[in-house]
Every structure is written in structure tokens, then in C-alpha cells.
Amino acid sequence: MTSPADVVVVGAGGAGAPLAARLSEDPGRRVLLLEAGPTPAGVRGFPAELLDPTTVQGAMPGHPANWSYLGHLTPDLPYMIARGRILGGSTTLNGAYFVRARPADFDAWAEVAGPEWSYDAMLPVLRRLETDRDYGDSDRHGSSGPMFVMRPPQASILAAAFTAAARELGFPAEPDKNGLGDPGAGPVPVNVHRPPGSHEAVRWNTGLAYIDPARARPNLEVRGGVRVLRVLIREGRAVGVETTAGPIEAGEVVLCAGAIATPQLLLVSGIGPRADLRALGIDVVADLPVGVAFSDHPDIAIGWRAQRPVVDSRERVAFPAALNFSSELLSPERLSSVHSPSVGSPAAAAEADLEILLAVKPLGYLLTGTAHTLAGGVRTVLRHPLRTLRALIGVSARRMAQQLTHRDDLQLIVALQQPAGRGRITITSADPLVPPQIDYRYLEEEADRSRMRLAVRTAVALLRTAAFADVFDGLTELRDAELGDDAALDAWMLAHLGTAIHLCGSVPMGSVVDSHGRVHGVSGLRVADTSILPWAPSRGPAATAVAIGERVADFMRAQG
């Protein structure tokens, strides 16, 4: 591609890869896809640890495929935030969790962004993007899309105990978390696929799904190793991007760099809160609330030990099952009556704002991919102390020793899926190479603390059911004295706090972009990633990120 592209897409991740691939289906549109990291071709082009869906080794701080941002979950709790720096973005690094946003999420976003984002409007997009190995072509699922989706078997010792424990507490079964059933316990849909010629199933990222089949198109260029520094804007119009390799002209620029990098690019380009930009000497192009109120899912890992060997090395996913439930309709008192049939039905009546995710691999294995006793993996970690920070949900420096001590623990990961609190992303320099400041402000709201307490206590109640009686041997970090006292439990939660790294809403539809992702006050500039969601969905956002790329591509193609 020698002449300027019609569209430059910045970021080849969960949304950017689908967007670029769909735009290039129109032969007359020249599309340039830029990625700061490498852009490997085919399954064999990716490092083995990034294909393995049983680990999250690529999310380890210091891995070349990871940006390793530094954030603060609370003012005194620093965390490393894993974000993908490779083709496929974070779909290449994450736990392969591929659960759709709930219909109520889409409908709530539509109240802000317009009816084109309602569940009914988005369902054709959700069906088009997937090949669902379990449900196939149906009114809710697709059978010919680029993203392969399956649900792990629930026959392993841990998965069977988890679902039985949830049933014992009265929670309903939820066999299809991408369907319309009541929230409950069930298998987690995952983007895992065994491609032809492969002996093992792999983490099926958006690069493999969307870009590989499109590489031969003469109107699509995929360029890796190019870091975009800022958007070039002249007289209120985006005309290209400045990169580490020089300026690149474009008819239109679409930022798909993710909910951290995208707001940073806007801010250093003069799009953001006027006072903040002026304080850094940045000329203001558009006074917009960029980065001022993002949301994410605070989470905590509840460590426990087993009575006997329960880890199945044949299990090809790390997180096969989850329980989703509502805090509003499940009181702590009900947890003391584990056999009460009234526990589940009311809790399923509302959209679930709490999640408990089952991890079936020990923490050490998740981080290192080392099997058996994990001693070799721990030695590897100790040789690289900066990489001991927890990859899955980040870790503070003060948690480093705890993570090493409990490397063989199993975990239930509890998360608050609809937090009241909001975080902020700011820049401290006009230099685009200076990382942004990411302040989560987690658990500042009592409503968030009370719901997280309920999630923690529910997770412990699951482990103490009859279903886990011949498996569970005890908690490894949480004591009954803390569990039974709100103030003590709050202190424990703050000391063990993590994040699901599901950041959304830093460039929201409504206040910063319109319903088609167009930035207010700047022509020729769009955003298409999870930063445009008004707030985080009540499930993980990976599947929604892909849908955003598909949806904005629809809008752009319809407009010519």
C-alpha cells in the first residue's frame, strides 16, 4: 500500500482486528492496521505460552507481549496492569473467558448511546462473530463466525464440586452464560479452538480469527512494531497519526488501542479536560471528559488447599465454571441455611452483580506453566523478581511474598461486576512515552465494600458445603475471625485486593464520542474499543470488545 490509507486503525486487539478485517471486506477501502507489538502470522507464529489456554504466562509483567502498566487500586496499593502488546491484544493474553454482556447491559448502554446498542440490535452482531461449538446456529448463537467458542466439560473433580456446591446453596444452573437464562452456576464460554493440524486446543485470539484470513487482501496492510504517539489534527480534522516511525497520513483514524492507551492518545493530542491539558502545555483541540470516570471489576482471590490431588492436567482451560448472582436478593443470613431452596430463585431474578470464578490450576502454574510441584516454576520466578507480580489480577509489591508462599493454592476469584465506584486516567506529561496515571479508587463506596463482603462470604460458603467435603482442606489466608467481622473483613479485602483488568468507560459514548464512535468536535476521528462503553458490563468484556469492533465497522461501511 503506497498511497495514504483511507482508514488507519490504531491497535490490533480485541476490537481493532475485527474492525480492520471487516472494513477491508470492501475492496475499494484501503485499510492500514497499526500494532505496537509484533503481528505474527498463523498459530505457529505465536509463542507457545500465548497459545496455552491453561495459563496466563503472557500477562506476566516483563513479558514482551504485555504493556505492564502501573496502576493504583487504592492510593497506597500499586498494581501492575496487564494489557496485550501483540496481534490480538489482550485476547492473546487473557484467561480465554468469552462471556457476552447481559441483555440488560446492552439495553442500559442504549439509554445513553442510542437504540443501535440495544440487545436486540446487537444480537445479530453477537451471532455473526462466533462459531459456537455447543449451540451452533440458533436464534441466540452463530455457527460460522471467526471466533470459536466452546464450554468446558464439567466432569473434573473441581468443576463437579463447584456446580454441586452452588446447587446445594440453592443457586440455579446456568448452562449457557451467553444465552437468556437466569444467572447462576455453569460453564464459562471460552475462545479456545483446536485448529486443523494442531494436537492441542489453543487460545483463539482475534489475530488468528480475523486477520489471518484477511492478510492476502491487497487493500489491507498489517504493520507491527509501530507505536502511535498522537493523532495529527489540522483545523479540527484528524489527518493521520504520528508514530515512532514517522507520520502516517489517513483519511480517517480509528483508535482501538484499549481503554488505557486510547484515552492517553486523545489527551496528548489535545482532546480532554481543558484545565488538565493547559496545565501540561498541551493545545486544547476539544474540551471533553476523557478518562474521568472509568469502571472496572475489583476482585479478590480466595486461596484454599485441597485434601488430595485434584488438579487434572488434561483440563485445557484454567477457569471452567463460574457462579453469577445478585447481591440485592441474596442476604448473608441465607448463607447459613445452605439447604434452603429459597436461596437461588430470588437471587436469579435480578441481573447478577457478583461473580465467583473457579480456578482449577494452582496460582504458580497459571503464572509459569510449570506442572507437578511447581518448584521449578517458583525458581524461575525467583530468578526474575520483577515478574513475581501476579499476572492474572495484578499484585502489589507487598503481596509478592504472599503469592510465592501460596503458589500451590487453588482459588475462587470473587468479583464485583457492577461497582458504584469510578476511577480516573490522567497524564502527567505531554510526552506520549510517559505512561498514564491510573487511579482505580476501588472500594471507596460502602455499597461496593458490602457487596464484596457478600461475595467473599458466599465463596467460603461454597467451599464449606457437603459437595466440597472430600476436597476442601481449609482456607490459606482468610481466617474465621476476619470472615465474621465486617471491619476486619474490609481490612483483609483491601490488603488482598486485585482487579479483573476489565477497564471500560474511559472515552464513553454520550459525553466523548457519539453512538458511532465519532469523537465530538473532531472530524475524521473515531474510537472503537471498550473505552466507549458508558461503564463496564456485568461480565468480562472480551466478547463485547469484539462486538464493538464489528459494530463500528458496520457503521463505517454503511456510511461509505
Regions found by a protein language model. Give the residues of each.
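N-terminal glycine-rich phosphate/pyrophosphate-binding loop and immediately adjacent elements
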Residues: 2-127, 279, 285-291, 296-305
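Conserved redox-cofactor binding core of oxidoreductases
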Residues: 112-230, 234-238, 301-305, 313, ...
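Internal hydrophobic alpha-helix adjacent to the cofactor/substrate pocket in enzyme cavities
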Residues: 166, 281, 460-463, 549-560
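Core beta-strand elements of the Rossmann-like FAD/NAD(P) dinucleotide-binding domain
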Residues: 3-5, 244-252, 256
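A glycine-rich dinucleotide-binding beta-alpha-beta segment and adjacent secondary-structure elements
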Residues: 50, 66-67, 187-194, 198, ...
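Residue-level detector of alpha-helix initiation sites
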Residues: 14, 18, 153, 259-260, ...
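Glycine-/small-residue-rich beta->alpha transition segments that form the dinucleotide
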Residues: 13-14, 36-39, 251-252, 256-263, ...
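Mid-to-C-terminal "cap/lid" subdomains and adjacent gly/pro-rich loops that border
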Residues: 216, 252, 273-406, 414-417, ...
